[in-house]
């Protein structure tokens, strides 16, 4: 029973590193590329934000909201290339396809830190709180955030099961 005290302290104070890239050697081109992105361009991660059934003016307001979130360096969208008053039918098809598909439009949120950094995952969480329904944040940073949240949600269950099984033995 006494061993549960240090086990509990260890459980509470142990931090899980979700940054898979931190385990790779510095000599890999992926690591070098990410370091260059962060050091020279001030960004290392991105997320695609898909917006469905939203008028252009509201999407422009949403873009501004996303840009105001901590650690979101920039948000790229249609209005960065063309004013929203220009009908989408007037722009070249390749540009239109890059931003629109049916009633959905895509924005690209650029973060000032790496894919699995705590600041990036916090920004993804904030984006998901701000956007509401019919807006979806995806990409590797979104996946890592989801994995982290699932692990944190399920870990107490596994710890309790392990504790009960150890009492049986």
Describe every region a protein language model picked out.
Residues 1-167:
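Feature of extramembrane
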């Amino acid at each position: 029973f006494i061993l549960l005290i240090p086990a509990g302290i260890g459980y509470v104070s142990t931090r899980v590193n979700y940054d898979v890239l931190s385990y790779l050697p510095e000599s890999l081109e992926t690591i070098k590329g990410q370091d260059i992105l962060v050091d020279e361009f001030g960004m290392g991660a991105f997320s695609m934000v898909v917006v469905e059934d939203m008028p252009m003016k509201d999407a422009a307001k949403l873009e501004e909201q996303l840009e105001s979130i901590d650690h979101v360096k920039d948000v790229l969208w249609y209005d960065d290339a063309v004013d929203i008053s220009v009908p989408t039918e007037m722009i070249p098809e390749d540009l239109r396809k890059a931003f629109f598909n049916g009633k959905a439009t895509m924005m690209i949120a650029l973060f000032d830190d790496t894919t699995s950094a705590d600041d990036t995952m916090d920004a993804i969480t904030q984006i998901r709180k701000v956007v509401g329904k019919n807006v979806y944040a995806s990409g590797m940073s979104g996946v890592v955030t989801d994995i982290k949240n699932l692990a944190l949600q399920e870990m107490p269950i596994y710890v309790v099961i392990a504790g009960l099984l150890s009492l049986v033995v």
